[in-house]
Swiss-Prot record:
Subcellular location: Nucleus
PANTHER family linked to this entry: FORKHEAD BOX PROTEIN G1
Protein name per its UniProtKB record: Forkhead box protein G1
Ranges of compositional bias, category Low complexity: 220-233, 241-256
Tissue: Expressed in uncleaved zygotes with increasing intensity until the 8-cell stage. Confined to aboral region during 16-cell and 32-cell stage, afterwards found in ectodermal derivatives, in particular surrounding the blastopore and along the tentacular axis. Not expressed in the apical organ nor along the esophageal axis in mesodermal and endodermal derivatives. Expression subsides after hatching.
UniProt DNA-binding residue ranges: 27-121
GO cellular component, one term: nucleus
Any one Gene Ontology molecular-function term assigned to this protein's record: DNA-binding transcription factor activity
Length: 318
């Protein structure tokens, strides 16, 4: 029995010399997605299985024939992760194994120059879409954009029926808008607040431009010169008498002097003077009587506490 052993070819054999002389195939510049799209688009049915895609790549590009490490896994990953490839189940009458892969007709990517590129003119690539985005930018950018602002209403001298509106004005920067808003705050009327205890000897004014005046001296506030930018104030309400008359009170049993009560100390603001009627006057008179009675009763109690009652001390018998 003769045993033959396989011998390795000599490194300087003819086969090795021919292999070294022939140029090695270069790796193609196409991406894996482009290779898959090329294989599917050149098939007659426009669909291929995974093994058929492998066969097309090996037959078309000899580089992948000799280097089978890694690229087949990359083909599988690109088929499952890329949205431009769609898996189509095999029909039950179709013999064979594996599903088919097709190109997605709704995909935004096309095969251009060996790479899958997005179609021009879609997804904001055109000039019209760019101009549309420019028009939707913030109103604070530089340009002739109009800042929309709510209208501000001021009351005029003729009453609430005639109102003065502030129209929107164009502004080109945030600083201009801030300056305009500050102007509105300066010229807007002051909010009227009614305190629980009015300040003594001076009336409550509607605006800092009106100087305070005693009620007993003048019946209406004296208005100072207004600047040209300020708005006219409301007409002054009708004046009221400086002092309220109260009926005489019954005398008490004590002869202690009571402090004088001057009803002129209770001052009214212009808003209150305009809204006071007969009912409120009666209420004020009633409150004045109560305060005077409380003051007199306090003086009586103070005098009784200070009074010394004389009681004779009995003498002890010696």
């Amino acid at each position: 029995m003769v045993v033959t052993t396989a011998t390795k070819p000599h490194p300087f054999s003819i086969e090795n010399i021919l292999k070294s002389a022939s140029p090695k195939p270069q790796k193609p510049l196409f991406s894996y997605n482009a290779l898959i799209a090329m294989a599917i688009s050149q098939s007659p049915l426009k669909k291929l299985t995974l093994s058929e895609i492998y066969d097309f790549i090996i037959e078309t590009f000899p580089y992948y024939r000799d280097n089978k490490k890694g690229w087949q896994n990359s083909i599988r990953h690109n088929l499952s992760l890329n949205k431009c490839f769609v898996k189509v189940p095999r029909h039950y009458n179709d013999p064979g194994k594996g599903n088919y892969w097709m190109l997605n007709p709704n995909s935004d990517e096309v095969f251009i120059g060996g790479k899958l590129r997005r179609r021009p003119g879609q997804n904001g690539g055109s000039l019209e879409s760019y101009m549309h985005l420019k028009t939707r930018t913030s109103p604070y950018q530089r340009g002739d954009t109009v800042c929309k602002r709510d209208r501000v209403v001021y009351l005029s001298n003729s009453g609430a029926g005639n109102c003065q509106f502030y129209q929107p004005v164009p502004c080109s920067s945030p600083t201009a808008m801030l300056s305009r808003s500050s102007l509105i705050v300066q010229t807007s009327p002051t909010t009227l607040t009614i305190p629980h205890h009015p300040p003594q000897n001076y009336i409550q004014t509607l605006s800092p431009n009106v100087s305070p005046v005693r009620v007993g001296n003048q019946t209406s506030p004296r208005q100072s010169a207004l600047p040209s930018s300020s708005l006219p104030l409301l007409p002054s309400p009708p004046s009221l008498p400086s002092k309220l008359s109260s009926p005489p009170l019954p005398s008490l049993s004590t002869n202690l002097p009571s402090p004088p009560l001057d009803t002129g100390d209770i001052l009214l603001s212009p808003f209150l003077r305009q809204t006071v009627d007969s009912t409120s006057q009666n209420f004020l008179e009633h409150m004045i009587r109560i305060r005077e009675q409380v003051q007199r009763s306090g003086h009586l109690a103070l005098a009784q506490s200070r009074a010394v009652v004389y009681q004779p001390i009995p003498r002890k018998s010696l």
